[in-house]
Amino acid sequence: MTIENVLPEDYAEMLKVWENSVRATHGFITEEDIEFFKPIIMEHAFPAVSLKCVKNESGSIVGFVGVHDAKVEMLFVLNEVRGQGVGTVLLQHAIEQLAATKIDVNEQNPQAVGFYQHMGFKIESRSPIDDMGKPFPILHMTL
């Protein structure tokens, strides 16, 4: 698997990866929440982070990671390739090449919490709401 740089013209494809991943792993998020977050991600979140992606043999993005100030701000993988090492490769790259040492993860996504713990992250603290004030508890984790 090769890590590639992301260009702004990749954002629409990445948003599809985000939505696919969220629908598969974030059962607590409603359709209204997904539609609320889409423009925020496209217009604010993607441009604010250093983005890297993994593509499949046909050149389609199957996962991506975004890092800012040593924090993994986003890591999403297409549900169809979960468990195939894409997330591991992206997170290792974020740690080794982008100096990532922190991540916030939805407490209601136990698969992600377990993945980050397996990768060496430990829970430091918990917030009862997310950054947007929504009732999604967040675990603050560090290496």
Sequence positions of predicted segments:
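Conserved acetyl-CoA-binding loop of GNAT-fold acetyltransferases
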Residues: 117-126
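A short, internal acetyl-CoA/4′-phosphopantetheine-binding micro-motif in the GNAT/acyltransferase core
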Residues: 72-82, 106
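Conserved GNAT acetyl-CoA-binding A-motif
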Residues: 96-108
